[in-house]
Amino acid sequence: MSDTDFDTALVASAFRVAAEQGWHKVNAVKAARAAELSVAEARARFPAIASILLKFGRMADQAALHHVPSEGTVRDRLFDLLMQRFDFLQAHRAGVLALLRALPGDPLTAMLLTCSTRRSMRWMLQAAGVDATGPRGDVQTHGLLAVWLWAVRAWERDKSDDLSSTMAAVDSGLQRAESIASWLDGSRPAPPAAKA
């Protein structure tokens, strides 16, 4: 078994364990045993639960970036990339939902995920053709992170087969982010001042 296959199998097993027992019951040993993988290899490759989470995030990014759209507007490309990332999450839905339920009581994991997801959003921006570097890139990255987190809330409640509610949330979030960015750039007039 290649390293990639091992990692994929262990991470998938970890999220199955989360779905069955809750996120706080997940560890690399339990995931390895459930998938009949080497515990020694699991220790070498996943020394902490954070390693599993970070690997899962990279796998989600790779799934999104595997088919980078080359046509359409930046907004169109970002929509496709984010939805491809949601397709990956959907394949592990029960485990991801277990993780999300655990976050309010686990601020360190929540912080880790926020930082990791912010890096992921920078990748999505750059893949869509946005120069997300420097202070402006930081603002754009935080903006896309806000869109993603907004859409995750919709995805949590979305029971449709085609993720229609999630798609609507991504689309409306990107539209709002685009409007704010245009206003900040001065390419759109500021909203009219309220009359006294």
List PLM regions with ranges:
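Amphipathic alpha-helical interaction segments
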Residues: 9, 80, 98, 139-150, ...
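Short, Lys/Arg-enriched anionic-surface-contact patches
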Residues: 1-10
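Hydrophobic alpha-helical connector segments
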Residues: 55, 66-101, 105, 115
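C-terminal peripheral helix-coil segments that are non-catalytic and often amphipathic
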Residues: 126, 157-196
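Solvent-exposed, amphipathic alpha-helical segments
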Residues: 9, 13-21, 63-67, 99, ...
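Amphipathic alpha-helical packing segments from all-alpha helical-bundle domains
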Residues: 107-130, 138-150, 168
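Amphipathic, well-ordered alpha-helical segments in soluble domains
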Residues: 52, 56-60, 88-95, 116-123, ...
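Helix-turn-helix
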Residues: 9, 13, 17-55
